Protein backbone atom coordinates (compact mmCIF):
# COMPACT_ATOMS: atom_id res chain seq x y z
CA UNK A 1 0.00 0.00 0.00
CA UNK A 2 1.49 3.29 -0.98
CA UNK A 3 1.24 6.57 0.87
CA UNK A 4 -1.62 7.95 -1.24
CA UNK A 5 -3.82 4.88 -0.65
CA UNK A 6 -3.03 5.03 3.06
CA UNK A 7 -3.87 8.74 3.13
CA UNK A 8 -7.16 8.11 1.25
CA UNK A 9 -8.05 5.31 3.68
CA UNK A 10 -7.40 7.60 6.68
CA UNK A 11 -9.54 10.35 5.11
CA UNK A 12 -12.33 7.82 4.43
CA UNK A 13 -12.17 6.58 8.05
CA UNK A 14 -12.22 10.19 9.28
CA UNK A 15 -15.35 10.88 7.21
CA UNK A 16 -16.99 7.70 8.52
CA UNK A 17 -16.10 8.66 12.10
CA UNK A 18 -17.55 12.14 11.52
CA UNK A 19 -20.72 10.63 10.11
CA UNK A 20 -20.98 8.24 13.07
CA UNK A 21 -20.39 11.17 15.46
CA UNK A 22 -23.26 13.12 13.85
CA UNK A 23 -25.51 10.05 14.01
CA UNK A 24 -24.56 9.58 17.66
CA UNK A 25 -25.44 13.23 18.38
CA UNK A 26 -28.79 12.86 16.62
CA UNK A 27 -29.44 9.67 18.56
CA UNK A 28 -28.61 11.38 21.88
CA UNK A 29 -30.98 14.22 21.04
CA UNK A 30 -33.75 11.81 20.08
CA UNK A 31 -33.24 9.81 23.30
CA UNK A 32 -33.39 13.02 25.33
CA UNK A 33 -36.67 13.99 23.66
CA UNK A 34 -38.08 10.52 24.30
CA UNK A 35 -37.08 10.66 27.99
CA UNK A 36 -38.71 14.07 28.33
CA UNK A 37 -41.90 12.84 26.63
CA UNK A 38 -41.89 9.72 28.81
CA UNK A 39 -41.69 11.81 31.99
CA UNK A 40 -44.51 14.04 30.75
CA UNK A 41 -46.68 11.01 29.95
CA UNK A 42 -45.99 9.44 33.35
CA UNK A 43 -47.11 12.64 35.09
CA UNK A 44 -50.21 12.80 32.91
CA UNK A 45 -51.00 9.14 33.66
CA UNK A 46 -50.71 9.76 37.41
CA UNK A 47 -53.01 12.77 37.11
CA UNK A 48 -55.57 10.81 35.06
CA UNK A 49 -55.47 7.85 37.48
CA UNK A 50 -56.18 10.20 40.39
CA UNK A 51 -59.10 11.74 38.50
CA UNK A 52 -60.40 8.27 37.61
CA UNK A 53 -60.24 7.17 41.25
CA UNK A 54 -62.04 10.35 42.37
CA UNK A 55 -64.70 9.86 39.71
CA UNK A 56 -65.13 6.20 40.69
CA UNK A 57 -65.50 7.16 44.35
CA UNK A 58 -68.07 9.84 43.50
CA UNK A 59 -69.94 7.41 41.26
CA UNK A 60 -69.96 4.74 43.98
CA UNK A 61 -71.25 7.22 46.55
CA UNK A 62 -73.95 8.43 44.15
CA UNK A 63 -74.97 4.84 43.41
CA UNK A 64 -75.08 3.97 47.10
CA UNK A 65 -77.13 7.12 47.76
CA UNK A 66 -79.50 6.14 44.96
CA UNK A 67 -79.79 2.62 46.39
CA UNK A 68 -80.58 4.04 49.82
CA UNK A 69 -83.19 6.39 48.38
CA UNK A 70 -84.69 3.59 46.30
CA UNK A 71 -84.71 1.28 49.32
CA UNK A 72 -86.43 3.96 51.37
CA UNK A 73 -89.01 4.54 48.65
CA UNK A 74 -89.68 0.85 48.11
CA UNK A 75 -89.70 0.27 51.85
CA UNK A 76 -92.35 2.94 52.29
CA UNK A 77 -94.29 1.59 49.32
CA UNK A 78 -94.19 -1.99 50.64
CA UNK A 79 -95.20 -1.07 54.16
CA UNK A 80 -97.06 2.07 53.38
CA UNK A 81 -100.60 3.17 52.86
CA UNK A 82 -101.78 -0.12 51.35
CA UNK A 83 -100.49 -2.11 54.29
CA UNK A 84 -102.14 0.31 56.68
CA UNK A 85 -105.46 -0.03 54.84
CA UNK A 86 -105.30 -3.82 55.03
CA UNK A 87 -104.46 -3.67 58.74
CA UNK A 88 -107.43 -1.33 59.27
CA UNK A 89 -109.76 -3.71 57.37
CA UNK A 90 -108.54 -6.62 59.48
CA UNK A 91 -109.13 -4.64 62.68
CA UNK A 92 -112.66 -3.87 61.47
CA UNK A 93 -113.34 -7.60 61.24
CA UNK A 94 -112.73 -8.49 57.59
CA UNK A 95 -110.45 -11.13 56.09
CA UNK A 96 -107.46 -9.82 54.13
CA UNK A 97 -105.98 -13.20 53.21
CA UNK A 98 -106.24 -14.54 49.67
CA UNK A 99 -108.48 -17.40 50.82
CA UNK A 100 -111.36 -15.44 52.40
CA UNK A 101 -110.61 -11.89 51.25
CA UNK A 102 -113.40 -9.43 52.02
CA UNK A 103 -115.59 -11.78 54.04
CA UNK A 104 -116.43 -11.05 57.68
CA UNK A 105 -114.31 -12.80 60.30
CA UNK A 106 -116.64 -14.73 62.59
CA UNK A 107 -114.37 -16.78 64.83
CA UNK A 108 -111.62 -14.44 66.02
CA UNK A 109 -108.22 -14.18 64.38
CA UNK A 110 -107.35 -15.78 61.04
CA UNK A 111 -103.85 -17.26 60.85
CA UNK A 112 -103.64 -16.61 57.11
CA UNK A 113 -104.50 -12.94 57.59
CA UNK A 114 -102.03 -12.60 60.47
CA UNK A 115 -99.23 -14.20 58.47
CA UNK A 116 -99.97 -11.79 55.62
CA UNK A 117 -99.85 -8.79 57.98
CA UNK A 118 -96.54 -9.93 59.47
CA UNK A 119 -94.81 -10.16 56.06
CA UNK A 120 -92.40 -7.35 55.36
UniProtKB/Swiss-Prot annotation:
GO terms for biological process: DNA replication. Zn(2+) binds at residues 95, 97, 110, 113. Keywords: Cytoplasm, DNA replication, DNA replication inhibitor, Metal-binding, Zinc. InterPro entries: YabA. Pfam families: YabA. Gene3D superfamilies: 1.20.5.1700. The keyword Lyase does not apply. Binds 1 zinc ion per subunit. GO terms for cellular component: nucleoid. Involved in control of chromosome replication initiation. Inhibits the cooperative binding of DnaA to the oriC region, thus negatively regulating initiation of chromosome replication. Inhibits the ability of DnaA-ATP to form a helix on DNA; does not disassemble preformed DnaA-DNA helices. Decreases the residence time of DnaA on the chromosome at its binding sites (oriC, replication forks and promoter-binding sites). Tethers DnaA to the replication machinery via the DNA polymerase beta sliding clamp subunit (dnaN). This is Replication initiation control protein YabA. It comes from Bacillus licheniformis (strain ATCC 14580 / DSM 13 / JCM 2505 / CCUG 7422 / NBRC 12200 / NCIMB 9375 / NCTC 10341 / NRRL NRS-1264 / Gibson 46).
Amino acid sequence: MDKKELFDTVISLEEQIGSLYRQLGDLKQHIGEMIEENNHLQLENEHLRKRLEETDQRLKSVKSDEKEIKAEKTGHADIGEGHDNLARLYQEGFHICNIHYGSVRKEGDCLFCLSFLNKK
